[in-house]
Swiss-Prot record:
PANTHER family: CASP-LIKE PROTEIN 1U1 (PTHR36488:SF8). GO terms for cellular component: plasma membrane. Belongs to the Casparian strip membrane proteins (CASP) family. It is a multi-pass membrane protein. Homodimer and heterodimers. It comes from Populus trichocarpa (Western balsam poplar). It comes from the Eukaryota. Residues 28-52, 101-128 are extracellular. The chain crosses the membrane at residues 7-27, 53-73, 80-100, 129-149. This is CASP-like protein 1C3.
Amino acid sequence: MAKIKKIFTNFLRLLALAATVVAIVFMVTSHDSAQVLNLTFTVKYSNTPVFKYFVIAEAIAGGYIVISILLSFKSLFWRLLVILDMVTAVLLTSSISAALAIAQVGKKGNTHAGWLPVCEQVPDFCDQVTIALIAGFAAAIIYFVLLLCSLYVVLSPIFVVTP
């Protein structure tokens, strides 16, 4: 049974790794140009600090996933995984939340602040950012499930009732 749990959690880690890689690739390659009143402006992820944070957080999570898969076969490392899985889940959640807030402003604008929506002028950029955010959201959900699995592995011996 323990072997099945490890296989399942490593499968989830590989899914999370795939989601983080997709999120990073789509965010880093997102760029577009638009011409407004004979002025050309270019948008790319690196123009926005929140999108940089998103990429860095996804990269940290992806690196941790690789390390955790390599070290998951050592029994002493499993207790530490709970804490690191929690940190990674929180990191992914904070980065996706911040990036979603900025993406919403880019898509809808903010009439109270006088910010106009930009996605009508740069649709390719917004489409790529949307795909990156969906992949990042998937990674965060997978990591939440991983956190629950890690908690179960660590806490299940505590709640075992012996007759």
